[in-house]
Each structure stands twice: as structure tokens, then as C-alpha cells.
Amino acid sequence: MSGKNLIIQGIEEAQLKSELPEFSAGDTVTVQVKVKEGTRERLQAFQGVVIARRNRGLNSAFTVRKISHGVGVERVFQLHSPLIDSIEVNRRGDVSRAKLYYLRDRSGKSARIKEKIR
């Protein structure tokens, strides 16, 4: 049992991305996603607030929420996915929770997040 676990662990460590920025819930990020349309491949930017982060090694994921034309859009990204080209932190948010699911119910000024001064 333990031997198989070590083999899987070794394979997963080889798949991990190393050049990822530090970010957490409340931060505003821009994620450049590789999108394939027919034979062409292009980058699509998705900018929004990180409302959740799930740290599970290779299975780590984060959820980004933005308001597009008055409609809330959430997208879950796998942190180490080959489809993610880059992640850029635009703004650090000062929040006191790890999961910001309460932002789903809020709109306008009540959905704003204070900026963290470092």
C-alpha cells in the first residue's frame, strides 16, 4: 500500500507547477487560460476575486468570481492545469475568512473588498 502511494506521490510532484504566485481568498487575480477554437489556440483573460482556495497538492483548485454585464460568473480553475498559462495578482484583499461564499448574495458596494496595505 505504502509503495504504491510513494510512486503516485513521485509522479504527482513531477507534474506540479513551480512558478505560481502567492495568492489567497480576497485577492483580485487575472488568469490567462488557453482556449482552443478549431485549430487555433489563444489566451483568454479571466479577471475576478478569488472566493475560495482548495490546497490538495496536484488537485489544488481555486474559484474566481466576477460580475459580467450584471451577472455573477464563477469559474473553478485547477491550480496546476496545463490550460492555465499564467496567474497575475492585481490587488491584495484584506478579508478575515478563507471562503468568501457570502459575496454571492451581495451586490454593489456591499460586495467590495478592502485592499490590504503591505
UniProtKB/Swiss-Prot annotation:
SUPFAM superfamilies per record: Translation proteins SH3-like domain
UniProt xrefs under Pfam families: Ribosomal_L19
Keyword DNA damage: no
Any GO BP annotation: translation
Entry GO CC: cytosolic large ribosomal subunit
MF terms (GO), sorted A to Z: structural constituent of ribosome
Keywords: Ribonucleoprotein, Ribosomal protein
Function as written in the Swiss-Prot or TrEMBL entry: This protein is located at the 30S-50S ribosomal subunit interface and may play a role in the structure and function of the aminoacyl-tRNA binding site.
Entries under PANTHER family matching the protein: LARGE RIBOSOMAL SUBUNIT PROTEIN BL19M (PTHR15680:SF9), RIBOSOMAL PROTEIN L19 (PTHR15680)
Homology family: Belongs to the bacterial ribosomal protein bL19 family.
Name the record gives this protein: Large ribosomal subunit protein bL19
Species whose genome carries this gene: Alcanivorax borkumensis (strain ATCC 700651 / DSM 11573 / NCIMB 13689 / SK2)
The gene coding this protein: rplS
